[in-house]
Amino acid sequence: MAAQKSALILLPPEDAEEIEVIVTGDVLVRGGLQVLYAGSSTEPVKCAKGARIVPDVALKDVKNKTFDIIIIPGGPGCSKLAECPVIGELLKTQVKSGGLIGAICAGPTVLLAHGIVAERVTCHYTVKDKMTEGGYKYLDDNVVISDRVITSKGPGTAFEFALKIVETLEGPEKTNSLLKPLCLAK
């Protein structure tokens, strides 16, 4: 049996978009991935709409590790991730190792801030201009995969984003097995 795949979801000190964090993490667990939430410490993070999420680990404890995917949620707090050198190191190590990076909503601006390349992206409409001015080609799709980077528009596309990650890491059969229990079957 293959080793369980791993995902690291990055949490800013505050103001993450909780739908993107919670839905993505939950779907990935249902898809068979081991999910860790990392914050600046292990103190609870107050999200943009008031939910509190307790990180499993502090960033300093995972900065030299690699994961199958590292995920950057959006929300106003992702600007703190863009300013954090440890996040930059973590993402660059992830790219060098050939791992995936996922970014949703305003999360792609963290890629821009740390020089992570993806030819095409999608993102929240409020940061579209910033991304195109930064040299990324914007696509008006709910989810875009380009150069081992998976991006998505925002809270309303969180299920589609998470399912695309599961499909990429575990295959379409696994993704299809999740649709009916999640009431997403067509």
Swiss-Prot record:
Task: Please tell me in which tissues this protein is expressed.
Answer: Expressed in various tissues, including pharyngeal muscles, pharynx-intestinal valve, ventral nerve cord, spermatheca, rectal gland, inner labial (IL) cells of head neurons, phasmid (PHA/PHB) neurons in tail and supporting sheath/socket cells, as well as in head mesodermal cells (HMC), excretory canals and coelomocytes.
What the record says about family reads: Belongs to the peptidase C56 family. DJ-1 subfamily.
Q: Which GO terms describe its cellular component?
A: cytoplasm; mitochondrion; nucleus
Under Gene Ontology molecular function, one entry of this record is:
glyoxalase III activity
Q: What keywords would UniProt list here?
A: Cytoplasm, Lyase
Question: Can you state which reaction this protein catalyses?
Answer: methylglyoxal + H2O = (R)-lactate + H(+)
Task: Quote the PANTHER family the UniProt record gives.
Answer: GLUTATHIONE-INDEPENDENT GLYOXALASE DJR-1.2 (PTHR48094:SF3), PROTEIN/NUCLEIC ACID DEGLYCASE DJ-1-RELATED (PTHR48094)
NCBIfam families (alphabetical): not_thiJ
One of its GO biological process terms is: cellular response to methylglyoxal
Q: What does this protein do?
A: Catalyzes the conversion of methylglyoxal (MG) or glyoxal (GO) to D-lactate or glycolic acid respectively in a single glutathione (GSH)-independent step. May play a role in detoxifying endogenously produced glyoxals. Involved in protection against glyoxal-induced cell death. Protects dopaminergic neurons from glyoxal-dependent neuronal degeneration.
Instruction: Read off the InterPro entries from this record.
Output: Class_I_gatase-like (IPR029062), DJ-1 (IPR006287), DJ-1/PfpI (IPR002818), Prot/Nucl_acid_deglycase (IPR050325)
Active site feature? E20, C105, H124
Asked if the Swiss-Prot or TrEMBL record annotates the protein with the keyword Transcription regulation, the reply is no
UniProt name for this protein? Glutathione-independent glyoxalase DJR-1.2
Instruction: Give the first-level EC class, as a single word.
Output: lyase
Q: What induces it?
A: Induced by DAF-16 during starvation as well as in the dauer stage.
Per the record, the major location class is cytoplasm
Localization, UniProt = Cytoplasm
